[in-house]
Amino acid sequence: MKRFSAVLLSTIMALTAIAQKNSSDKTLLWKINGNGLKQPSYLFGTIHMLCKDDAVLSDSLRSIIKNVKEVYFEVDLDNMFEMLGVLGKMKMNGDTTLQDLLSEADYEKVKNYFESKGSLLPFSMLETYKPMLAASTLQQGGLPCETTAMMEQVIMEEAKEYKKPIRGLESMGYQASVLDSIPYKLQADQLVSYIDNAMKGGDEDKELSEMLDAYRNQDLQKLEEMLMKSDPSISNYTDVLLYNRNRNWVEKLKDLMPDKSLLIAVGAGHLPGEEGCINLLRKAGFKVTPVKNITMLVREI
């Protein structure tokens, strides 16, 4: 296990990048037109957690939000009822806990580590969660700032200013169930390895910082190169975590886009490669082109 922080970003924060032909394509924002569309739609790659000062919308993205008919995220983030209903699906099936999956020594190590980090959720709750979801709560502590933000939340707040409907490409329940396809034991072992390396002063925080820099720079090629170093035991589940969902989304978008202009804001990990949303949309007959997405960040990169 060499790159668990990268794995977490690619699976939970979805930060895989798109392979690019030249540096002019350094952007997170893409225009979708052609194939009979009466008006264009737009695709934007998000990150689910970053420093608040970096959660800045470009003028281009603000204009798009103002002019599209609806905004689609991976899930409907404006549906509080659904969000409350999905809490139970974050837990492992069969009343499984981390204590069932780990040796006594490893369990105590994980418990002490979480409690020492002062997680927002009590360990008694986190130990019932699917280990990769529990592990994702550790990432926020690795960010080089005190105040964090979600790009999706920033986009949604802007959309609400213009009373744009908020939709989801899939249900929260389905999204939470995806991790059931990865053996809980494997997830738990990865969590232990991550904590072992972090306690030894490993370079996970450095890698996380480099990934966030690449995201701020919109250097999707760099992100992809870093994430290709992910642990192969988790990479074996890329179809379930990313590609199957990409295919489902594109099929849905093929029906939605002819009738209305959309902004589709999903984790940047869903954009890349042969099975990424950009290429799948192109295969479906749409023209997908980069859009300049220049932001004025509060602090230097």
Predicted regions and their residues:
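Conserved phosphate-coordination/catalytic loops
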Residues: 23, 52-55, 240-247
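Alpha-helical hydrophobic packing sites
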Residues: 4-5, 48, 269
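A cross-kingdom marker for long, charged
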Residues: 235-301
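Structured, acidic catalytic/metal-binding patches in enzyme active sites
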Residues: 28-237
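Bacterial Sec-dependent N-terminal signal peptides
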Residues: 1-25, 30
